[in-house]
């Protein structure tokens, strides 16, 4: 018996909904083969009307995820582009689309995706991890795609872009765009961008950059900027007591101002709440940073045991089911600083059987930390292996070449690396920041072989000449950034 047309439609929708739920159940059971067997025929059907519902859009997302993990990245990207055009597409699908483009070196497509997200999908754009955005911008810079980079930076410096990982606009993008606008002969536009800088490290970077320094007349002193930021963050803490973000960033500013005990007190004011999964709306993304800032504050006071404990707690928060990559490296670096290189190497063994890979930058930090530990122990053969890796991947973190040479007491290599960075317009500011003078820390750090080599290298005539040619260093009335 044939059903009347009026009944066929609801029945078909009911059957489709049941199929979508089967796809969802298969994904929850980690059965991607079943997800693809059930979902691909629907997703690849010419008639996309079945995908218009929330369940349909969810099915597309799950198919894309399974295509990606199964290695069918080309098809995953095609389906992600189609799926993100659906009214009910999720922010997660937009993120996967961008990630596929990033990993596939599809730079123009990635910029197009950023553009589309900026036109009505602001929450998706804000949820893109800053490290992904940074990787895209580095790819564009390294491939000399300045027009595409400028397009991306214009979006990333708009008032509508407020990345979830930062409190307020991200100054690094303003700096990069100001450099491009200056190079393009638009100093007034660059000056306007620089006038909006609020973070002390960004202001310091602009002052050290010969291209931007003439445009920084009248900019606030870095310490004044830090005090202004602290006021802003304290206001945000008061207005948004259910958020960790402003509290963490206020603590970082207090530490920059040489007030680490105040930073600790502020962080500890919510210590009895951070284990409550409902206490803070941004707990999932910010708890790791809360522990990181607590560790850095204890480190500023030379309280090794408390700093190490905080780093371990931060690492345990996890990252894709594993110990947090950066927190474990930070812990190893702390152990090296306080004369515990054997413990540092033991800490780093967690990466020996990684079922995941770090970012290119993260891997450089891993090899640098391991190399410095070997140097402290006098294990020159093992150090040489780490040096070889770092030199072979120099473009991923040029400063790591300098750092491992300083750890190893190699004056010639350290000087050569510094001179090379100072001559490179894209590396110059980072080198000058590292070489500049800062306010004295509240507690003197323990002496290290790294520090001894550094003092010798910066007194060399060739290094002094390179510093002068790069525009010179400054003294800043705050503590060293990210110390």
Q: Locations of the language-model features?
A:
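N-terminus-biased targeting/localization segments
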Residues: 2-152, 161-172, 176-193
């Amino acid at each position: 018996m044939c059903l009347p047309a009026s009944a066929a439609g609801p029945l078909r929708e009911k059957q489709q909904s049941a199929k979508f739920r089967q796809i969802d159940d298969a994904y929850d059971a980690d059965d991607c083969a079943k997800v693809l067997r059930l979902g691909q025929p629907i997703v690849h059907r010419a008639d996309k009307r079945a995908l218009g519902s929330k369940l349909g859009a969810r099915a597309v997302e799950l198919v894309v995820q399974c295509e990606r993990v199964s290695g069918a990245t080309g098809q995953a990207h095609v389906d992600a582009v189609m799926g993100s055009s659906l009214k009910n597409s999720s922010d997660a699908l937009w993120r996967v689309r961008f990630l596929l483009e990033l990993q596939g070196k599809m730079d123009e497509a990635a910029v197009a995706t950023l553009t589309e997200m900026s036109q009505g999908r602001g929450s998706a754009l804000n949820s893109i991890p800053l490290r992904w955005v940074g990787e895209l911008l580095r790819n564009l810079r390294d491939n000399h795609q300045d027009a595409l980079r400028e397009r991306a930076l214009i979006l990333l410096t708009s008032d509508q872009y407020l990345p979830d990982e930062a409190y307020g606009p991200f100054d690094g993008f303003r700096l990069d765009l100001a450099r491009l606008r200056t190079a393009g002969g638009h100093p007034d536009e660059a000056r306007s961008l620089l006038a909006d800088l609020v973070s002390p490290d960004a202001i310091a970077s602009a002052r050290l950059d010969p291209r931007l320094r003439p445009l920084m007349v009248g900019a606030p002193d870095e310490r004044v900027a830090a005090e202004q930021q602290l006021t802003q963050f304290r206001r945000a803490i008061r207005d948004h007591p259910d958020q960790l973000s402003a509290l963490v960033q206020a603590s970082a500013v207090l530490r920059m101002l040489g007030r680490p005990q105040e930073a600790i007190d502020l962080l500890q004011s919510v210590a009895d709440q951070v284990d409550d999964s409902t206490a803070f709306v941004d707990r999932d993304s910010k708890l790791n940073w809360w522990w990181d800032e607590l560790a850095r504050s204890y480190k500023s006071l030379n309280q090794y045991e408390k700093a190490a404990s905080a780093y371990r707690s931060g690492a345990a928060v996890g990252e894709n089911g594993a110990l947090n990559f950066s927190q474990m490296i930070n812990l190893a670096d702390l152990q090296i600083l306080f004369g515990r290189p054997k413990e540092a190497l033991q800490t780093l063994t967690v990466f020996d059987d990684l079922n995941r890979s770090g970012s290119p930058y993260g891997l450089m930090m891993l090899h640098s930390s391991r190399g410095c530990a070997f140097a402290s122990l006098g294990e020159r053969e093992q150090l040489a292996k780490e040096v070889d890796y770092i030199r072979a991947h120099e473009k991923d973190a040029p400063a790591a070449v300098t750092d491992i040479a300083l750890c190893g007491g190699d004056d010639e290599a350290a000087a050569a690396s510094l001179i090379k960075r100072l001559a490179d317009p894209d590396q110059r500011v980072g080198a000058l920041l590292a070489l500049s003078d800062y306010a004295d820390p509240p507690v003197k750090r323990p002496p290290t072989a790294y520090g001894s080599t550094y003092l010798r290298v910066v007194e060399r005539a060739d290094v002094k000449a390179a510093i002068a040619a790069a525009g010179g260093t400054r003294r800043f009335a705050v503590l060293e950034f990210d110390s």
